[in-house]
Amino acid sequence: MAREGFTLECTSCKMQNYISKKNKKLHPEKVKLSKYCSKCSKHSVHKERK
């Protein structure tokens, strides 16, 4: 199956906050999103992590 699950990790505190899925064939690059981190209590960049 092409769709793969991954977690999003906060770049500030390294906490894994979100779980998501993507199609690896259509989007092979790593995901970077601005999301809210409950540990930092602010919006920060979250990067894809296996």
Swiss-Prot record:
Keyword Ribonucleoprotein: yes
GO cellular component, one term: ribonucleoprotein complex
Disulfide bonds: none
UniProt KW Cell membrane keyword: no
Organism lineage: Bacteria, Bacillati, Mycoplasmatota, Mycoplasmoidales, Metamycoplasmataceae
InterPro entries: Ribosomal_bL33, Ribosomal_bL33_sf, Ribosomal_zn-bd
Pfam families per UniProt: Ribosomal_L33
Transmembrane regions: none
Annotated source species: Mycoplasmopsis synoviae (strain 53) (Mycoplasma synoviae)
The protein's name in its UniProt record: Large ribosomal subunit protein bL33
